[in-house]
């Protein structure tokens, strides 16, 4: 009798359990695949914006995923530049990347915007966040205005058309497959 009830329960629940991801629903295949940094690894590219509340809420789940990601998976962050006002924070990201201070500045910058509700609209305010985290002012100034940061920000601006994005956060796998929280059914299901 117990086996019979178990079988009935499984039959009732089975349609609710998804077997996998469906193209066109959970993700889309990019019409023009993009090259990855290292073709020998699976690349997961996150397109984000510091001012995006959805990106902020994805961060804890993303951090947990990163702690347990397989060794053959490379994770790359790219700040999206979907408008002129997004450029300042994209340059902030590339500044922290080039200075090697991502781990100490990334989360505090998100928290200034989303927890403390600060509007970051000037280079001076961005610099203050970096300095608060132990970055020297002259290092920030030199890097923020560098050719490398300007070039990387320009490439990030092109991502809008290359990946066909209209919002963030977005994950692109191996330069071929794009998903978002909206497509996948939530932040957790993106990962």
Indicate residue ranges for each PLM-predicted region.
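Extracytoplasmic thiol/disulfide redox context detector
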Residues: 2-87
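Short, flexible active-site loop motifs that bind/organize anionic cofactors or intermediates
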Residues: 45, 116, 130, 139
């Amino acid at each position: 009798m117990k086996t019979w009830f178990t079988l009935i329960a499984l039959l009732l629940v089975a349609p609710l359990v998804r077997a996998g991801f469906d193209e066109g629903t959970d993700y889309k295949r990019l019409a023009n695949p993009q090259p990855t940094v290292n073709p020998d690894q699976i690349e997961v590219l996150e397109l984000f914006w510091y001012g995006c509340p959805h990106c902020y809420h994805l961060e804890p789940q993303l951090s947990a995923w990163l702690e347990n990601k397989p060794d053959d998976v490379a994770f790359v962050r790219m700040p999206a530049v979907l408008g002129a006002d997004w450029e300042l924070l994209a340059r902030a990201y590339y500044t922290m990347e080039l200075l090697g201070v991502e781990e100490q500045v990334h989360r505090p910058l998100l928290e200034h915007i989303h927890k403390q509700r600060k509007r970051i609209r000037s280079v001076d305010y961005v610099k203050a966040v970096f300095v608060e985290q132990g970055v020297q002012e002259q290092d920030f100034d030199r890097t923020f205005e560098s050719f490398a940061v300007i070039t990387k920000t320009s490439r990030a601006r092109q991502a809008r058309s290359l990946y066909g994005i209209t919002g963030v956060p977005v994950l692109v796998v191996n330069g071929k497959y794009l998903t978002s929280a909206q497509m996948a059914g939530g932040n957790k299901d993106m990962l």
